[in-house]
Amino acid sequence: MAVRLILSVVVGLALSLSPAAYAMKQLELKSHSHIAAIDFPLSGKEKAWLAAQPTLTVGTWLPERTPIVYDGDEKSYQGINADYLALMAHSLGLKVIIRQYDTEQQALTALADRQVDTLLTQVAHRDALAPGLDQSAPLLKTWPTLVTSLKSPLPPLTTDRRVTLACTRDCAFFDIIQQAFPNAKITLYDSDYQALASVVSGENQYFIGNNITTGHCISKYFSQSLVIAHYFRQQEQHNRFVTRDDRPELHQLLDRFIHA
């Protein structure tokens, strides 16, 4: 009886620590862009490494941001990231598998447990890393953008007056807001769409967000009512590959491809 009890505890613990315990979806990489392979010369060492590892498992985590990743299809991974990964797969002769986790911590745990080879971070991701990890050069670079309504004359790009400004709850640009609009009344929204709609309705005078997701949302929903009035050339954000520091060959290959 005691032996059975011990075995049941051990099995339960093993299951709780298994990869299946992660809140993870394996997605099909899907690209809608015409892919022409990059002329990417490989050393003999790199060719041998690729031959030994024909599959690259990439981890990501939610929430993703459109158009960097489209969230309409729960079975496939599409968007700017997917186009880039498809180009890399085609150029290097790799099969790329996407594993999407619910949280960043789950993705980091999967990387530490070797369930994935690398992580592709969020664009708003911080640059600081935990010990034992390396990061690649940036894939995408984004900048803060200031949006106003087309219905009214162009308002000032900086003022000490009280203005109303919208941004999303995960906004990373409060330092810029403080510099440009120190007396702004800021309202936070769950999405770019909701925040931008508040400028259309006149509830807010301005919106600040990154140029990629903001530009996509305006072109899709608000092209007749909103305009990007200014790009702030500071506080740029990136997304990067993250690898374990015991995978130097992978880290170097990813960096070389980004710079190709």
Language model region names:
Residues 1-5:
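Positively charged n-region of N-terminal signal peptides that target proteins for export
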Residues 6-16:
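Bacterial N-terminal signal peptides
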Residues 23-123, 127-131, 185-189, 196-197:
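Extracytoplasmic small-molecule ligand-binding "clamshell" domains
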Residues 24-46, 82-91, 151-174, 178, ...:
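Extended ligand-binding regions for polar small-molecule ligands
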Residues 57-63, 133-156, 169, 240-245:
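Hydrophobic/proline-rich hinge and linker segments of small-molecule sensing/allosteric domains
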Residues 61-65, 103, 123-125, 149-152, ...:
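Solvent-exposed coil/turn segments that connect beta secondary-structure elements
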Residues 69-73, 82-95, 135-137, 158-161, ...:
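Ligand-binding cleft/hinge of the Venus flytrap
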Residues 105, 109, 120-132, 197-233:
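A ligand-binding cleft/hinge motif common to bilobed small-molecule-binding domains
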